[in-house]
Amino acid sequence: MKTIIAEKPSVAREIARIVGATKREEGYFEGGGYAVTWAFGHLVQLAMPDGYGIRGFVRDNLPVIPETFTLIPRQEKTEKGYKPDSGVVSQIKIIARLFKESEQIIVATDAGREGELIFRYLYHYIGCTTPFVRLWISSLTDKAIREGLRNLEAGDKYDNLYLAAKARSESDWLVGINGTQALSIAAGHGTYSVGRVQTPTLAMVCERYWENRRFTSEAFWQLHIATDGCDGEVVKFSSSEKWKEKEPAMELYNKVKAAGCATVTKAERKEKTEETPLLYDLTTLQKEANAKHGFTAEQTLEIAQKLYEKKLITYPRTGSRYIPEDVFAEIPKLLAFIGTQPEWKDKVRAKAAPTRRSVDDGKVTDHHALLVTGEKPLFLSKEDNTIYQMIAGRMVEAFSEKCVKDVTTVTAECAGVEFTVKGSVVKQTGWRAVYGEEKEEITIPGWQEGDTLTPKGSSITEGKTKPKPLHTEATLLSAMETAGKEIEDDALRQAMKDCGIGTPATRASIIETLFKRGYMERCKKSLVPTEKGLALNSVVKTMRIADVAMTGEWEKELARIERGELSDDTFRKEIEAYTREITSELISCDKLFGSRDSGCACPKCGTGRMRFYGKVVRCDNTECGLPVFRLKAGRTLSDDEIKDLLTEGHTKLLKGFKSKQGKSFDAVVAFDGEYNTTFVFPEAKKDKKFSGRKK
């Protein structure tokens, strides 16, 4: 008998049908000489510190660096702490028996880092010695599964993939466990979660937040003239220069207004080619789904995974935007299939040779770019259909013609002021026709240098400089992809993918972790750090744990392990040294968390004392631990203001707060019924008496 292990029951069911394992048993299917079983994600995990006899957060125990990591069944949280998940333990026993009774194991977990780790951890935990081979496929269509089963690969071919996954798992454990314990011990109150990837990600969110909030907008003035163009159109020139002072701008405006003509000083005409966009990888799909449709990164991943399991798209957790030659041979057939769908029937043009920009064998590693499979997308929800159609539409764009334009730039001088205008004429719409999003630009007449133009009007406008906007999930994913470097070019971004922080498969969960930990929140599409997130970042922002570039280097090292260019032992020694450094650095933060008595009892429990800890005031009763963060809407509360809040339930009317839109406001800070702080505005007070909570 051979045992096939899939990552999920739904995938196991499809494989079982194809191999003839039609008899349903407890935890597996059987028949045709096969047993087809399944995991449900990670059945086995690394033991927590208490698995090594280390309990609680104790300074002398740090850093915790196990000589050998211990594997245990996945745990679930109960009122009495963590215990093995009974369903997981039961499934492990079934899998262990099947493995033992089999002559061969076929590994059919997801074909990627985590899928490999799910199987290998389980295999090692069981202590199995049965030989195994790998089913490595990029879609779950019947055709792909059958071809994969006919061409099974040696299990050891993916040893380096496993070693990279194992190194990532262990490094996250070392940094997360030791960093969190060290910082929490230093703080002396509460738990402050830090991580190898989550902390640098938070640092980027906080840095952008402060850059936005501290930006001072400046006014500027710009001049404009208008003249007749082609076919009755008006061509509007704008001054090349912008003035920071209104007076000199007005002086020049009056001269321009009085001038009777303008002279063309330069006329440039050149052909511009806009390359087709590359196909989607997961991160690019997540970015565009967030920007265009407001989907979260996690939501997009969940939908893509669902579409994959329904056989509608190829493997979603891909980091490549290219396809190999053998897959390119299937593209005409797939485009013809897309063209049969109502949404695309008028958009797909039959071509003997589709554009090859997204074709490159050398840029495809484990999995190629996202494609639809040719299975009909029936009965999809609105959200699922949106993601499916995005992938189909990108395929149509990627294999269409280039967009070609004639671009004209004209410079003219009027009353000593230089003006410019730019326009274009589309010669070949190409891929831009797919969504019809190409804006119509004004056609510039065939003016030549020395031509005289007669202005039909002039104007002066006032503008204001704007800060960089707060991060959205789309822009944060871009920043994670390039370790904070701002790169617009698709090909350059793809070349940097090994230097980013996180991976396409993990970035969504990292972002969600920051929400779950209470470090940031969503405000419409923007990501806003919370008081807790800002307080944490203020402590660690100059430390190695928050170093975005260094985290990008770790990802690069993991990619080298995967390629067989670096030993996992070398990486382990480096990460252990790094762990010792960041643990020492974080535990020395106690000077930043030094506490003093506020002189106030806790308004919530009544038994604890409220103590000042730099950025936060907290109850010293461990069963309560009420926190009050000093930073509120860009303003730090003073000791006296905090004391008013603790004793009266509210402060006096305070000035100098700043809204998320950057506007200043005045408000009272008060406790609500759950002892969360909230703003109360002057108009909310009645008869000069405050109606908020008072202890």
Residue spans of the language-model regions?
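Short strand-coil-strand connectors
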Residues: 30-32, 226-230, 413-417, 661
